[in-house]
């Protein structure tokens, strides 16, 4: 495996600024077990706690401990049973409901024994380093259609939010993709259904490593059930998996390099809490590295303009150049969404130079979040929108 060397990085940046692998990549035989051991060792060195959890009971027990620690609250046994059965492992909820819970409803209400209510965070999105990361491997599920044993899973506050499937070097990467596909069909839903909380999947054969959202996999299952067979690329296909990269868009394919960048704790937590979008169509999208870089550079420019009193000047501006089909609308949506949460931002304006772009952009924004944007046809409407304090994000 290559050696990783960070040339330039910022504690605030999700994507490493520049990286340069040293040494030649090993093509020597390495078993899947050896690759898995090396991966877990590297995660442990990066601050992940390794746990020997191989069954549902141990996973649920650890989940209770981690949620108690995150929320600084000890459940009674009766409270935990109610909260787990209704809020976490509800038999009527599937992958989409659980994705919505993580992305939009991560604070759940506990009904306490004394009749009062308490907010319980599943994940802390404001202070990401309050979240606790653990790694488990060879988890076994025996209550599905078939017995399955999963490779490596990342737990965030006890919930499995990232799953990694490995193949030995030389094996086609798509085999790992197909294996996760089988797990979804046969066993992720089984038992308490906690593996339906997985937001991001990572597949690697050591030499090449990619990631994708749970919707990429889940859509494939639904499409098969509906009897659809499409020749073109769809969002559920292997082609919609993504490589990780540095800020210069240099791909980081090797598992060691990928682990030191993508699985850096602040990077992974930022991706999970900021750079996933659960759309109005109930699909989960995870942004690509160049989209994250563009978003953070725009936000950084806004911060600098505010801190150095450059608002309203040319120095406060800038531009991002992305090619056709690169997902510019999604980048602009996420940028606007995050910018609107800044305490000194009241309104975010999005200006296009063609009417067809206006319609297309509004349609896409509505897909990302219903009612997220308001269009206008003349300056009178624009004036009313700007003067309407009720629509300011901090007044909602």
Label the predicted regions.
Residues 353:
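Short beta->alpha hinge that forms the Motif I/post-I loop of the SAM-binding pocket
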Residues 350:
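Glycine-rich and small/hydrophobic secondary-structure elements
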């Amino acid at each position: 495996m290559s050696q990783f060397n960070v040339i330039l990085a910022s504690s605030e940046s999700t994507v490493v600024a520049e990286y340069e692998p040293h040494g030649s990549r090993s093509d020597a035989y390495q078993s899947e077990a050896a690759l898995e051991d090396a991966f877990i060792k590297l995660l442990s060195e990066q601050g992940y706690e390794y746990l020997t959890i191989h069954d549902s009971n141990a996973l649920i027990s650890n989940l209770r401990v981690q949620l108690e620690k995150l929320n600084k609250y000890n459940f009674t046994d009766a409270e935990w049973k109610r909260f787990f059965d209704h809020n976490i492992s509800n038999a009527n909820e599937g992958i989409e409901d659980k994705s919505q819970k993580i992305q939009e409803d991560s604070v759940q209400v506990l009904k306490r024994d004394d009749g009062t209510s308490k907010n319980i965070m599943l994940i802390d999105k404001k202070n990401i380093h309050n979240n606790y990361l653990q790694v488990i491997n060879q988890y076994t599920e025996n209550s599905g259609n078939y017995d399955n044993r999963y490779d490596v899973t990342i737990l965030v506050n006890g919930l499995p939010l990232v799953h990694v499937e490995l193949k030995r070097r030389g094996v086609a990467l798509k085999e790992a993709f197909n294996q996760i596909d089988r797990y979804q069909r046969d066993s992720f839903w089984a038992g308490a259904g906690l593996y339906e909380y997985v937001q991001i999947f990572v597949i690697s054969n050591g030499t090449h490593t990619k990631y994708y959202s749970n919707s990429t996999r889940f859509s494939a299952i639904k499409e098969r059930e509906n009897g659809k067979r499409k020749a073109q690329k769809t969002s559920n296909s292997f082609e919609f998996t993504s490589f990780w990269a540095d800020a210069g868009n240099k791909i980081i394919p090797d598992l060691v390099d990928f682990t030191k960048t993508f699985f850096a704790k602040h990077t992974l937590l930022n991706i999970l809490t900021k750079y996933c979008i659960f759309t109005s169509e109930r699909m989960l999208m995870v942004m690509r590295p160049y989209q994250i870089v563009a978003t953070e550079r725009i936000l950084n420019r806004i911060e600098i303009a505010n801190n150095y009193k450059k608002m309203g000047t040319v120095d406060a501006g800038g531009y991002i150049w992305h090619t056709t089909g690169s997902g510019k609308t999604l980048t602009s949506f996420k940028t606007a969404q995050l910018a609107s949460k800044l305490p000194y931002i009241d309104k975010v304006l999005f200006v296009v130079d063609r009417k067809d772009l206006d319609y297309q952009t509004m349609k896409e924004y509505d897909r990302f979040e219903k009612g997220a944007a308001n269009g206008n046809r003349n300056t009178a409407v624009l004036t009313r929108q700007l003067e309407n304090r009720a629509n300011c994000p901090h007044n909602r």
